[in-house]
From Swiss-Prot:
Organism: Syntrophotalea carbinolica (strain DSM 2380 / NBRC 103641 / GraBd1) (Pelobacter carbinolicus)
Annotated region described as Domain III, given as residue ranges: 147-197
Gene Ontology CC terms, in alphabetical order: cytoplasm; Holliday junction helicase complex; Holliday junction resolvase complex
Family: Belongs to the RuvA family.
Entry remark concerning the domains of this protein: Has three domains with a flexible linker between the domains II and III and assumes an 'L' shape. Domain III is highly mobile and contacts RuvB.
Keyword vocabulary terms for this entry: Cytoplasm, DNA damage, DNA recombination, DNA repair, DNA-binding
Assembly mode: Homotetramer. Forms an RuvA(8)-RuvB(12)-Holliday junction (HJ) complex. HJ DNA is sandwiched between 2 RuvA tetramers; dsDNA enters through RuvA and exits via RuvB. An RuvB hexamer assembles on each DNA strand where it exits the tetramer. Each RuvB hexamer is contacted by two RuvA subunits (via domain III) on 2 adjacent RuvB subunits; this complex drives branch migration. In the full resolvosome a probable DNA-RuvA(4)-RuvB(12)-RuvC(2) complex forms which resolves the HJ.
Region (Domain I): 1-63
Region (Flexible linker): 142-146
Region Domain II, annotated ranges: 64-142
UniProt-annotated location(s): Cytoplasm
Protein name: Holliday junction branch migration complex subunit RuvA
Gene Ontology terms, MF aspect: ATP binding; four-way junction DNA binding; four-way junction helicase activity
GO biological process: DNA recombination; DNA repair
Amino acid sequence: MIALLNGQLIEKTVSQVILDVGGVGYRLLIPLSTYYALPDEGDVRLRVHTHVREDALLLFGFLTETEKDLFGLLLSVSGVGPKVALNILSHLPAADLQQALSQGNAKHLATVPGIGKKTAERLVLELREKVGPVQAVPGNAPLPAETAGDLREDALSALVNLGYKENLSRKALDGIDTAPDAPLEDILKQALKLLMR
């Protein structure tokens, strides 16, 4: 089983990356959190979950061991496959997911598109004891808080890299109302909603 890949980033889209490792190109499916955190080029290291099916071998890449472990836990729940697990991690940061599971907050889990009330309740029922309380994990500690201006500039850069014009991206960012401590993912989600109208 492949557990870790360290190589040159060849291609990056919102759902997958291609890494060149020793002349071999590996395609890894990724959550949005990994997409936003990866550089556009250069060397990257991803933790890998290898998923084997009868007809395919799928690789899923994560920046942190915590995300990889949560992905594996989500797959252990009946009715949750790789696409659903990746969707959950794309919409909920790892700490939020851990907190929702450990506190039995099925309502918060049901805010993820494609996750209904029954699935959310099943996730809580099967994973609540496995996740335990949220703790700071070495290597996954949050980085120092960025200023709101830095986050806006990062969001602008991400939108331009996605192909949106800079002036339209600035208007979208100016048109959203986010909390001063809102994470980059939330800022981008709201801006993308405006840009897709």
